[in-house]
């Protein structure tokens, strides 16, 4: 955070990712929000009420002009750096916090951005205390030494699979849960075809499919991913799904890494405990 930005604690805030609202919610700062993108996707009741009462502008999409920001009443911005817009150049006097939480490889690193938001908003003590609680809970669930089983995690778009590199968010989270992540080589995610996926699955004990299916709570692998149904009919695997459209994986989970860790830990130990973010899929086995 730029030194000059920190001197001014914004009372009215604009955000360019619905993800960032969860950091504000953790600090009870939703009432500072005067503008957001994709308001129709929000499940935060305070922010939705502000939008209904015309206290918060809903831009609905990310194509926001500097003129729209200027008339929103925002005194500070949580920006989305990969969009490529330098809001500081448009508003030199306005505090801007570029949010790079998505680049963090450690689950606690993503949660720790709460401290940056707290400092930006003048809530340093509160944010540090909140993060320490998250960190302590995470560390209490951590498995000290990674072991079997081997886990393949693939994001499925409906036409192709994407796999994260060996050093990534998933590798850290699964190692802390007692598993071994099977990632791709290099430092960037790669797209896999069906043959590459099957080759990977032959090495795995557990398959976790991450997808985005709005309104879909039916966890049948043969429906979610028909291309692999024949494979799972003849190859016994433990299969789980993570439907990010329904479970808040890119929202509340940022500040619940301890819950993610505990659920994966239970998943790898074949526990039948309830899970918020991961569901066992029904295969033909």
Task: List where the protein language model places each region.
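Extracytoplasmic ligand-binding site segments that recognize negatively charged/polar headgroups
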Residues: 20, 29, 36-47, 85-88, ...
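Second-shell loop/turn segments in exported
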Residues: 3, 9-12, 23, 54-60, ...
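Structured C-terminal subdomain patch of bacterial secreted/periplasmic proteins
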Residues: 104-132, 209-285
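His/Asp/Glu-enriched short active-site or ligand-binding loop at hydrolase and phosphoryl-transfer sites
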Residues: 170-190, 208-211, 239-243
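Solvent-exposed loop/turn segments at secondary-structure junctions
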Residues: 13, 19-22, 39-42, 64, ...
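Basic- and aromatic-lined ligand-binding clefts that recognize polyanionic substrates
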Residues: 12-18, 22-25, 124-177
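Sec-exported extracytoplasmic/periplasmic mature domains
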Residues: 18, 25-29, 71-74, 118-126, ...
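A short, structured surface patch at a secondary-structure boundary
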Residues: 1-83
